[in-house]
Amino acid sequence: MLPDHLIIRLILQDDARALLSLRLEALQDSPEAYGEDYDFVAGQPYSAWTDLVAHSLGDGDRAIFVAEIQGQLIGMVGVNRSPMKNTRHAGSVWGVYVQPSWRGKGLATELVQACIGWGQGKGLATLRLGVITANPAAIHCYEKCGFRTFGVDPNAFFVNNRYYDLMRMTLLFTP
């Protein structure tokens, strides 16, 4: 059941610092789930983050959506359209994160649905994502949103002396 006062919305430039905090939290909480690591993101100048946010407001080829309750960001997801001419019909969902105390309440599904709506609004034919096979809750969320598996990259991530396989999933929009 979705929490009261939940807002799913596009990121605002004023959210940059809170979003960076949330991203760093995600990388500490679940380092195996992401391609980039905490030290890399924490080591970037703050201007790199504000630039990312400025280009992710949803009006171009990239968007970041957040889950907010009473002014606090508790979840996030990014989506972007491929910049290449031959693949501009496709987009990628990335960086899905919901704070642990809010998991199991449908927030990730709402965030992914926001990406789906954005992709459809941009006229995309497909959205893709990657998820580690060791995360059945995330896989279930994506399947519930209509994504289907099309392959697995063995040993895609190496985190804390362990390999993780990455399941590739796609959602095809019907014309």
Regions picked out by a protein language model, each given a short descriptive name:
Residues Q99-K105, T133-A134:
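Active-site acidic-Proline motif in GNAT/NAT acetyltransferases
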Residues V93-V96, L127-V131:
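Conserved hydrophobic beta-strand within the GNAT/NAT acetyltransferase core sheet
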Residues M1-I11:
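Acyl-donor-binding surface of acyltransferase catalytic domains
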Residues V112, G119-G130:
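Conserved GNAT acetyl-CoA-binding A-motif
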Residues H5, A125, I132-I139, E143-C145, ...:
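C-terminal "cap" of GNAT-fold acetyltransferases
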